[in-house]
Amino acid sequence: MSAHATGANPFADTEDQAALRQLARDVADRELAPMARHGDETEEFPQWAWDGMRKAELFGITIGERWGGAGLGDVEAAIVLEELARADVSSAILAQLIFNGPPRAIEHLGNDTMKDRWLPIAASGEGLFCIGISETEAGSAVGHMRARLRPDGDGFRLNAYKNYVTGGHKARACLVWCRFPDSAGTKGIGAVVVDLEAPGVTVAGTHVKMGLRATSEAELAFDDVRVEPDDVLLWGDPANSESFKTLISHINHERCGNAAMCVGAAQGALEYAVNYMNERKLGDRTLADLQGLQWKIADMATQLEGARLLLQRAVHMAGPHGTPPALETAMAKTAANLAAKFVCDEAIQLLGGYGFSREYPVERVYRDIRGLCIGAGTVEIQRNFVGTSVLRGATPASDGWKSRRA
C-alpha cells in the first residue's frame, strides 16, 4: 500500500496494485482535487467526483465478477481510498460506501435475489448505497435502537427513524439495522435492504456539518415500509445476539476504509506542509532549515507511517475475501484517526495564518478528519474494545505479544 514500497517490505504493492493506485491517484488529481473547495463551500453533492470514479470503473473493485466487479479485497479498497482521500475526503466517502458499505454486506450475507438486484447497480456506479444504524437515542449504544419490523403476511413492515445516514439524500437503497419481532437489547437485531423509492420512505432532513460538507448526513424516516422476505439481509433471532455480532464484524471493512481515508488525507496535508516549508523564505533561509520545525515534520511523518503500517497489517490479514480481524482493525482505526488529527493540526500550525485560512486546503482537511474520528465507531469505542480485549488475554498478531501469564 505504501507509495514508496520496495524491496523486502511485506506490504509492498504488487504490479497490479501499483497500477490501481496510479489510476486512483490520476482520478483524484484530475476530478476530485480541483473541485474539493467548491464542494466544501456549497455543500453540493460531488457529482463530478462520482462521474469521474464511475468512468474509471473504480466502484466495482470489491464486488464479484459475476455482477460486473473485479472481485478484489480490503487491500485494494484501502489503496484506492487512500489516494482519493489525499485529494478530497468527502468524495472518497462515496467510494467507501460502495467498497465497504451495503454492497459488500449484500454480497457476503445476502440471498441470490438480493445480490442479482443490487450488486450490478453498485458495480457499475448506477446508484449510491447508504447504511442506517444511528438513531436519536442509539448511536454507539446500538442495543438501544427502536427501529422495528412487524409481521405483515409473508413479509414485514418497517418503522424506523435513522439519523446521520451518510449519502442518504442521494442513495438508491439503504441497509437498515433493525429489531426483528420480540427482541430486546442486542438480541434479535438484524438488517434489511430497503429501496429508498419505496412508499413510506422520506428524507426528513439533513445536518449542517463542520466538515465532510459535500457528503450529506440525512435523516431517513421509514413509515410502515413493506419489506419482502427477499429484502431480509440477516434475520435477527430474538433468542441470541449472533446476527448483531455478524453485522458488527462486517463493520471492520468500513473501519479499515475509514483508516485508509485518514492516512490519505493526512498524507496530503503533510505533503502540503513540506512544500510550503521548502518554499517559504526567511531571509536567506527557508522554514525547512529550522531544526524545531524539522522535528515537527519528523513527528508528523512518524505517526502517519505507524498508522499506515497498522492499517496494512489489518487489511492483509483479511486475505482476498475475508474480514479484517477486530482487534487489529480497532488499533488501526484508532492510530489512523489520532495520527491524522495530529498531522493536520500540526500542518495548520506550520502554515501559520495561511493554515487557518480557507484559501488553503489544510483547514478543510482538518475539519474532514474530525468527522472520520467519529464515524464507523468513535476513537473512544475502539479504545474500549482494544483495552478490554488485551485485559482479557487477547493479543494482536505480532509474535512479541506472547502471553506470560502463569
Which role does the model predict for each range below?
Residues 125-133:
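A short, Trp-centered hydrophobic/proline-enriched beta-strand micro-motif
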Residues 137-140, 164-167, 180-183, 209-216:
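Short Gly/Pro-enriched turn/cap motifs at secondary-structure boundaries
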Residues 130, 144-148, 173-177, 191-193, ...:
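Conserved hydrophobic/aromatic beta-strand scaffold that supports enzyme active sites
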Residues 159-203:
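A short core secondary-structure module
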Residues 100-108:
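Helix-loop "lid/cap" segments that line or gate small-molecule binding pockets
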Residues 224-245:
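Long, acidic (Asp/Glu-rich), low-complexity accessory segments flanking structured domains
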Residues 144, 197-228:
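Flexible, small-/acidic-enriched active-site or ligand-binding loops
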Residues 1-91, 97, 109-114, 121, ...:
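Alpha-helical interface subdomain recognition
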